[in-house]
From Swiss-Prot:
Protein name: Peptide YY
Post-translational modification: The peptide YY form is cleaved at Pro-30 by the prolyl endopeptidase FAP (seprase) activity (in vitro) to generate peptide YY(3-36).
Species assigned in the record: Homo sapiens (Human)
GO molecular function: G protein-coupled receptor binding; hormone activity; neuropeptide hormone activity; neuropeptide Y receptor binding
Major location (coarse): secreted
Gene: PYY
UniProt signal peptide: 1-28
Amino acid sequence: MVFVRRPWPALTTVLLALLVCLGALVDAYPIKPEAPREDASPEELNRYYASLRHYLNLVTRQRYGKRDGPDTLLSKTFFPDGEDRPVRSRSEGPDLW
């Protein structure tokens, strides 16, 4: 008897793992603060504006430093040692004979 393996259990497992990963990403994003009522007290407004400022600072965080372009990414991938090390020829290395 020939046993035919169906791919649906593996596909279901992969989809469930993907949903778990996406759920973790959604939970990591900060929640926008709720706006206070129209007749809110000044303390509530101050808390709202402080939490809104904190939210905007998190969402629009400045990125400092040089961004890597595609050429830099390729050079880091193929040459992980960097350009700090001088290139030596084989004649300068130890004799292997």
